[in-house]
């Protein structure tokens, strides 16, 4: 998931079908983050796809976790693209919708299906029992729900048992956040992904954030949260503030169905 699925351009978005099959045949792809480290002399942060969706599904199975793939909704990174040339028109979305449907088939389909056979040929004839799929990452504005809607309709029609996750955008409050939550309710997504990269004070003051959330609407997926002081370093203070926030997540488990610390798998120097 994350901004990787968007790509700096629509051509460099994460395409899951390039990440399955024989490892030696998988293409490389430029990473959304390849230029965001000023100390690096070269834009050398590429994706080899040696670790793809099949391997992620295997990892989830091995550690007893539920896989939650995030797919592109037809929008490249909106921070990087204010115009429309790197966004897919709504009437051209069918290949992207097919990618979502095919991924569910790859994860859960019988070995007699096209993508179930690919999974079986890779050594896993049994279903991965995928339960969740997220469409879009930190998208915002009307561009997002108008693209999300046909995905929701198609997935509901073919795989009604799959829980669909929409996004509340990159902010934890404000104009875009307030716009997207009613849209997610209108589209009847199952969960809404909220992201928080905020100060220690914010985390301490937000322990009761979900006490007053609507219990009749979509559930919450706190998909990215991390306490960021000025220097963004981890410390006892940041851990304490995150723990305070987590008491609110646990207390409101009837509405906060899922949560994930970011980064759940830490990296070192962009590797």
What residue spans do the PLM features occupy?
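Catalytic-core region of carbohydrate-active enzymes that cleave or remodel glycosidic bonds
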Residues: 58-59, 153-156, 160-163, 181-186, ...
């Amino acid at each position: 998931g994350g901004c990787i699925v968007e790509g700096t351009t629509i051509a460099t978005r994460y395409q899951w079908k390039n990440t399955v099959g024989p490892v030696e045949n998988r293409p490389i792809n430029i990473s959304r983050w390849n230029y965001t480290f000023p100390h690096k002399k070269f834009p050398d942060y590429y994706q080899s796809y040696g670790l793809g969706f099949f391997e992620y599904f295997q990892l989830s199975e091995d550690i007893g976790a539920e896989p939650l793939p995030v797919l592109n909704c037809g929008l490249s990174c909106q921070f990087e693209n204010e115009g429309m040339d790197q966004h897919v028109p709504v009437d051209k979305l069918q290949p992207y919708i097919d990618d979502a449907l095919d991924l569910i088939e790859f994860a859960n389909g019988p070995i007699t299906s096209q993508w179930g056979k690919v999974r079986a040929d890779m050594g896993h004839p049994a279903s991965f029992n995928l339960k969740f799929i997220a469409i879009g990452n930190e998208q915002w504005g009307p561009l997002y729900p108008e693209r999300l809607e046909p995905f929701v309709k198609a997935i509901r029609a073919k795989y009604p048992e799959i829980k669909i996750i929409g996004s509340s955008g990159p902010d934890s409050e404000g104009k875009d956040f307030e716009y997207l939550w009613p849209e997610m309710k209108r589209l009847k997504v199952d969960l809404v992904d909220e992201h928080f990269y905020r100060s220690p004070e914010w985390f301490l003051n937000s322990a009761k954030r979900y006490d007053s959330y609507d219990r009749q609407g979509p559930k919450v997926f706190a998909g990215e949260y991390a306490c960021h002081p000025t220097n963004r370093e981890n410390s006892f203070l940041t851990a304490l503030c995150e723990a305070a926030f987590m008491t609110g997540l646990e207390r409101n488990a009837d509405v906060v169905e899922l949560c994930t610390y970011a980064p759940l798998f830490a990296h070192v120097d962009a590797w």
